[in-house]
Amino acid sequence: MKKRVFAMLMACVMALSLMACGSKSDSGDAGNNGGDSGVETIKLGGVGPLTGGYANYGLSVQHGAQLAVDEINAAGGVSGKQLELSFQDSQGDPESAVAAYGKLMDWGMNVFLGGVLSGETASVVTAAKADDVFIMETTGSADKCIDGNDKAFRVCFYDSYQGTAAADYLNDNQLATEVGVFYQSDNDYSAGLYNAFVAECAKTGVTIKET
């Protein structure tokens, strides 16, 4: 998990570097992107379940992101600027994620790392667009969780990609012609993978016997 989050945050850092370089030739308002030459710290914000049923997942992402921030800062930061991370608890609830996002904006967030869960990101993506905040989504994998925001980008696989890849692997390696599937229908991530898996199995001839 730490390696995955580190790689994701490094992608964010590269994007920030480009933004910082671009701001040098921009005499206008730098907005909330952390590119203002007067800003010594780039504030990164994240939202996720630090308590509740999904806390183990949220805490892993938070700790991995903080580790990456510490290592990047120790190496000199981004274009001479230090990174600062604030991670707010959503308890895994989309409505609580909106309140958590609001706290990050009050704090002065420059870049939003998205929600740990897809539903969290989907609940704030419109507000982030209105606030002109750059989003680098690191773990929310639902296909449409960042739709409608042209400043939102993603560095993780889509659910449909993962579900399709799983079905293709099953078929390509002739592992089974009939399968049963356990999934959580009220969980966006689980349901997204399931739907893509079932759709691809229908194309490859693998029969879903039980779900």
Where are these predicted regions, by residue range?
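Flexible, small-residue-rich helix->loop connector segments that border functional cores
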Residues: 66-78, 170
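Extracytoplasmic "Venus flytrap"
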Residues: 38, 42-66, 88-94, 117, ...
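Short, low-complexity disordered leader/linker segments with a strong preference
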Residues: 1-43, 74, 106
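Beta-alpha junction/loop-to-helix N-cap segments that form part of ligand/metal-binding clefts
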Residues: 28-32, 36, 56-63, 75-146
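Short acidic, glycine/proline-rich loop/turn micro-motifs
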Residues: 147-151
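Structural recognition of the beta-strand scaffold that forms the well-ordered cores
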Residues: 43-47, 84-87, 110-115, 133-139, ...
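Alpha-helical elements of the RecA-like P-loop NTPase motor core of helicases
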Residues: 55, 95, 122, 164, ...
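An alpha-beta-alpha
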Residues: 152-211
